[in-house]
């Protein structure tokens, strides 16, 4: 029994380690890189495909990847993208170079830059944007979630969990589903009352089609590539990561499902409300806890750690919705625009959809709904049920905290209004946490009235392109800055924005009032011009006019301001110097890249052969995560032998993934000694498999573990598919099209050696798909070998003849002549070899004489 128990414990531990390696939360890996030295001394390299696990909780300044080469740090860094992929950032040498929007990026966010606040300055602002709750409230939520777990289960986890599991658990604690759960209005109060910075900007430039992308005026964040927050329905592991497509030599992109041109809001589903540019934020429906921002019902699991829309189409989650407004504010906001309330609904792709007038403002979700109740735990509750709770039950979900968000009277009719504005005698300060909070316009008119019509404001609006072409627009006296529906001039708006950026705090209301009194021109405030003019002497007025006339001749602009009650012959002239006609400095443009230039490779001082490289990123929540790979330096005239892994080195595709991890040797007999003999003749080996990038460590460890007769497999770059685990398995096992990846990969490697001839000499595979891929890169059938699960080796040119790896090893000198002897006709032109061309013809035999 002890033996059985030890065996079961060993198997369980191995399976647990295997699952940990395949867990998407910690799935990281790096594909080996091949660098080819050219005749002229330059270098070419294959793409650097490096992927880290789910890092959606990282802030921008943490997404810097450090690189160590052969144990020494190098002056080269990468940046993390939206899906955990790493890429280099290259500054464009010329402004005329065209870069697709999907490849544009921001510079690497160094930790020492002043634009990125420290941890102590961030406070609750370090929470991602999607986590719409105060810092204390989020702590309370996590504590309540932990209290729902049995105590003995926590003790068991704390005892048996390794540091890697604890890191993965900490990551799942702060994963995207928790961030995207909407909160009631009271919980959003703290963020709505202060200017909170955004360290994570949802949605990257270049990931949206033109018809679905936001205009420059609608964005409140810099166009950064490394903060794309993507959520997709995960009803099955196969679709868990299938929404991201990552082809060889390219960056990952979102696999968008085809959507109809017009979207209709279905009954019983709440649509995401994204108001038009410049318009007020008026959601047409209130989104409860069971509806996601795209209007799709969400199944809430018992643990409360995952959100799954019912649809199977890949879905991109938008920014969190605004706090549901009261009926009074909705009517007032709609009235300002001259539109009836709830007359239109805006989908995420800015499609305007009419909503029936009889549609209720709040989606009805009864407690008796089977879909609603079957996912609720014993202590779970939907957010839209909170208003019906009494104060005692509400206190369970909103404990007292320093932020003052204790238990509220949800049952009172005026509770929501009091939660939104706990101090009605003070006007709430403007915030910058919504999409339409800030806009620029050259409409002017603040001297006449603070109320500028929306049509007039939009008619002279300033876009991002206008500001980049002429930054001097900020000095224009007609500039009007719109913040949360209120209009300010630049003298008032600049301190507000600067206070947010530098100190992450909003200016006090007293300071705002003082700025408005001193800096904001009012129509009734021009009286001081009159008494000032009464003190002017006649000679001073004439001197001022002469000075103004002289400056007008020099091309300077003047503006004449006069009040209604003054005489027309006594104007006051304010001198406004014109901007110098200089070309605004061009902002450097950066692009993503997966390859290094020849000069960058030369500075790495690579050794010939294998060079160990480690990619590491240090995060606040996960510590330091590392990915290991190898950079191989070859020459332009090296001859390469390609080898598949699954079914070629292993005996079968499926079991080749599993059995070696359980300690069983599942390798074909004789392949190790054959490959070793081929390597001794001067050939390089390249392993190409359609496995996912997350299995890089497992694959490399297996190839190093294989041994036969004291010989091990030759070292060589292991080229895997950069796509996700389930995408790679689906392509190889379900679709059975691994050649799609292999053709792209091998063609790219072939380009590194051109125009110096064909680098590939022979190839080993196990499927017709492998033969097809090898033919596409120019390999002749005489040097393409396939093996079946029984170990029978077949040469594609002579399919009727079957051999084995062991027999092929006996004639390796004939099929793989040593490269060290220099070029020969056998190697360069096999059709003119001694066997194919120069051999003596067979003598003619008369078959009749044999009878």
From Swiss-Prot:
The modification Phosphothreonine is found at residue 159. Inhibited by N-ethylmaleimide. Contains 1 Asp-Xaa-Asp-Xaa-Thr (DXDXT) motif, a catalytic motif known to be essential for phosphatidate phosphatase activity. A motif (Nuclear localization signal) lies at residues 141-148. Magnesium-dependent phosphatidate phosphatase enzyme which catalyzes the conversion of phosphatidic acid to diacylglycerol during triglyceride, phosphatidylcholine and phosphatidylethanolamine biosynthesis therefore regulates fatty acid metabolism. It catalyses: a 1,2-diacyl-sn-glycero-3-phosphate + H2O = a 1,2-diacyl-sn-glycerol + phosphate. A motif (LXXIL motif) lies at residues 655-659. PANTHER family: LIPIN, PHOSPHATIDATE PHOSPHATASE LPIN3. It comes from the Eukaryota. It comes from Homo sapiens. The gene is LPIN3. Significant expression in intestine and other regions of the gastrointestinal tract. Belongs to the lipin family. InterPro entries: HAD-like_sf, LIPIN, Lipin_mid, Lipin_N, LNS2, LNS2/PITP. The modification Phosphoserine is found at residues 161-162, 224, 463. This is Phosphatidate phosphatase LPIN3.
